[in-house]
């Protein structure tokens, strides 16, 4: 979210590059992922011009952007390039997971199950939504070894809460998972959940800098 990127940049402690990746349904998988991987490679390749340290690249995103951040870290082209991930309520399964949170918060909590289904089908396009490059939570433990140290911030009242929790458990000790129990989906993007937003800025900043 642009407002979160602005807040991170305003800290004065890091450079922030916001990727304007192509969106579904006009540009289904893998177009958006390709754009993200291209951007990471660009940042590393042009680190001198951007005045950044290529050894300290963090990649982050919320919801579908969190999915793209994870998929970028898993891609062959980005192996070894990303020092850390910062994820907010990421999509890790691009299909109805029928978990408790999916059923309990599937309507009226910022992201409805019906809308999520439309988004998932639009992004997957002609590709199987269970494909590990789309549903990153389906990756096996060997593939997940590519995941760097990660901060995963969850919304407790969110349709995606349980799939994020399951993903964190699969990755293991490299993930720090923090949950705001009363928050709903999109709390870093849509104004109105100021406490969760403010604490997330601090959490993300500290996590990125305290390597």
Located regions from the model:
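Alpha/beta-hydrolase superfamily serine-hydrolase fold, recognizing
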Residues: 1-211
């Amino acid at each position: 979210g642009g407002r979160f990127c602005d807040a991170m940049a305003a800290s004065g402690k890091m450079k922030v590059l916001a990727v304007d990746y192509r969106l579904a349904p006009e540009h289904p998988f893998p177009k958006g992922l390709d754009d993200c991987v291209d951007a990471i490679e660009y940042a590393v390749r042009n680190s001198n011009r951007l005045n950044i340290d290529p050894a300290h690249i963090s990649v982050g995103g919320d919801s579908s952007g969190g999915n793209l951040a994870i998929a970028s870290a898993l891609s062959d082209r980005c192996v070894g390039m990303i020092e850390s991930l910062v994820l907010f309520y990421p999509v890790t399964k691009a299909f109805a997971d029928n978990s408790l949170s999916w059923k309990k918060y599937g309507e009226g909590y910022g992201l409805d199950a019906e809308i999520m289904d439309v988004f998932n089908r639009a992004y997957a396009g002609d590709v199987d939504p269970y494909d590990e490059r789309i549903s990153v939570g389906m990756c096996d433990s060997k593939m997940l070894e590519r995941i760097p140290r990660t901060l995963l911030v969850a919304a407790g009242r969110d349709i995606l809460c349980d799939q994020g929790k399951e993903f964190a458990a699969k990755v293991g000790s490299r993930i720090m998972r923090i949950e705001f129990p009363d928050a709903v989906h999109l709390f870093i993007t849509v104004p109105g959940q100021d406490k969760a937003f403010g604490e997330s800025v601090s959490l993300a900043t500290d996590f990125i800098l305290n390597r």
